[in-house]
From Swiss-Prot:
This is Tapasin-related protein. Interacts with peptide-free HLA-A*02-B2M complexes or those loaded with low affinity peptides, likely facilitating peptide exchange onto higher affinity peptides. Interacts with MR1 in a ligand-independent way; this interaction may stabilize MR1 pool and facilitate ligand loading and dissociation. GO terms for biological process: negative regulation of antigen processing and presentation of peptide antigen via MHC class I; peptide antigen assembly with MHC class I protein complex. Keywords: Cell membrane, Disulfide bond, Endoplasmic reticulum, Golgi apparatus, Immunity, Immunoglobulin domain, Membrane, Microsome, Repeat, Signal, Transmembrane, Transmembrane helix. Residues 19-405 are lumenal. One of its GO terms (molecular function) is MHC class I protein complex binding. SMART domains: IG, IGc1. Residues 181-297 form the Ig-like V-type domain. The chain crosses the membrane at residues 406-426. Residues 449-468 are annotated as: Disordered. It comes from Homo sapiens (Human). It is found in: Cell membrane; Endoplasmic reticulum membrane; Microsome membrane; Golgi apparatus membrane. GO terms for cellular component: endoplasmic reticulum; Golgi membrane; MHC class I peptide loading complex; plasma membrane.
């Protein structure tokens, strides 16, 4: 078993033992511990900017000395790194890195990665400065890139060796650098750039925040912050900040300048995400001496909408399942059939339409299936599985046999006929009543007119009979 595995086993035992024997305190305390990582050292001949191949790298270990981490009581039996514990027939190159000048906020993720079932990928390479030859000869610089698997953080460190002199007793044969009495290469971390997660997924139209933080040694000045997007072989500038001035190339992109100086936070916010925002984002921080970057993958997702319809009422009806508005492209469509009292069974034979893409970039497709209702009818379900869905999305419909459809048609037609008869009968019942009211009204009008005529005749008669 390797040294790093042994250290991890001891740490895991200490964590589990502490958890069983004593309760966790209500509030944790900070404790400085040594974080030991298995790494690879890229040889000087390796191509810069790319991961070195197995032939171009050597085994190495990185010891981050006395890193403050939050202790909940589980680190009581944890011991710091001892140089003699790594003595082997073929010992790795050991880099001791002091973190007194910077902060390592994700040190806990590095410390507990193995015990959490995650892996830490660590590669160390030479870091070259654009400086005078005299300055370069007095020291050496290295960059360590560490990534925690499973969506964990990613950290890049720039390490500087002490001033190189020829009076050192121990000397590394290949690095041409002095060694400590324990046989390690001593360095100090002067600059770090990190992100909390290396990959993010957001829904179409939502707002995304891409995390990017940094820490630098006293005496260094922040020169610029640059966010770039790489997608399908094309690169473009998204946001830049230089000398206190920010410029958003992508509409709506924001970076809080106040956070740069106070919290060393260079996170980028992107509102109203579109398909064009998907890709690999590069956060590059430049100081007066160093430059480092982090890479974040942004994935855009759109959930599908499912609609199931019956295309025709033929002897063997056709079902059409429309899946619309989803992204990315990969989608799985399954059909199931369930008879009354039975269990769902997957059916085959479905066909698919050509793929359609909207102006927004989302996809749509239709799946068709010839249904076999059987003697008692059956329920068909179209089920869609997509990365944007926590669980499959489905739509169901019941298909009845032809004879039941005929019976239902007869019942429906009979119902319409009865309703029509009832409506006509109701109209006929209301018609005489209305006619009687009209006749009564006419009779009253006639009677009133006759009465008035009679009174007028009597009045005229009376006037004629009076003597002159």
């Amino acid at each position: 078993m390797g040294t790093q595995e042994g250290w991890c086993l001891l740490l895991c035992l200490a964590l589990s033992g502490a958890a069983e024997t004593k309760p966790h305190p209500a509030e944790g305390q900070w404790r400085a511990v040594d974080v030991v990582l298995d790494c690879f050292l890229a040889k000087d001949g390796a191509h810069r900017g790319a991961l070195a191949s197995s032939e171009d790298r050597a085994r190495a270990s990185l010891v981050l000395k006395q890193v403050p981490v939050l202790d909940d009581g589980s680190l009581e039996d944890f011991t710091d790194f001892q140089g003699g514990t790594l003595a082997q027939d073929d010992p790795p190159i050991i880099f001791e890195a002091s973190v007194d000048l910077v902060q390592i906020p994700q040190a806990e993720a590095l410390l507990h990665a193995d015990c959490s079932g995650k892996e830490v990928t660590c590669e160390i390479s030479r870091y070259f400065l654009q400086m005078t030859e005299t300055t370069v000869k007095t020291a050496a610089w290295f960059m360590a890139n560490m990534q925690v698997s499973g969506g964990g953080p990613s950290i890049s460190l720039v390490m500087k060796t002490p001033r190189v002199t020829k009076n050192e007793a121990l000397w590394h044969p290949t690095l041409n650098l002095p060694l400590s009495p324990q046989g390690t290469v001593r360095t100090a971390v002067e600059f770090q750039v990190m992100t909390q997660t290396q990959s993010l997924s957001f829904l179409l139209g939502s707002s995304a925040s891409l995390d990017c933080g940094f820490s630098m040694a006293p005496g260094l000045d922040l020169i610029s912050v640059e966010w770039r997007l790489q997608h399908k072989g094309r690169g473009q500038l998204v946001y830049s900040w230089t000398a206190g001035q920010g410029q958003a190339v992508r509409k709506g992109a924001t970076l809080e300048p106040a956070q740069l100086g106070m919290a060393r936070d260079a996170s980028l916010t992107l509102p109203g995400l579109t398909i064009q925002d998907e890709g690999t984002y590069i956060c590059q921080i430049t100081t007066s001496l160093y430059r480092a970057q982090q890479i974040i993958q942004l994935n855009i997702q759109a959930s599908p909408k499912v609609r199931l319809s019956l295309a025709n009422e033929a002897l063997l009806p056709t079902l059409i399942c429309d899946i619309a508005g989803y992204y990315p492209l990969d989608v799985v469509v399954t059909w199931t059939r369930e008879e009354l009292g039975g269990s769902p069974a997957q059916v085959s034979g479905a066909s698919f339409s050509s793929l359609r893409q909207s102006v927004a970039g989302t996809y749509s497709i239709s799946s068709s299936l010839t249904a076999e209702p059987g003697s008692a009818g059956a329920t068909y379900t179209c089920q869609v599985t997509h990365i944007s869905l926590e669980e499959p999305l489905g739509a169901s419909t019941q298909v009845v046999p032809p004879e039941r459809r005929t019976a239902l048609g007869v019942i429906f037609a009979s119902s319409l006929f009865l309703l029509a008869l009832m409506f006509l009968g109701l109209q006929r019942r209301q018609a005489p009543t209305g006619l009687g009211l009209l006749q009564a009204e006419r009779w009253e009008t006639t009677s009133c007119a006759d009465t008035q005529s009679s009174h007028l005749h009597e009045d005229r008669t009376a006037r004629v009979s009076q003597p002159s």
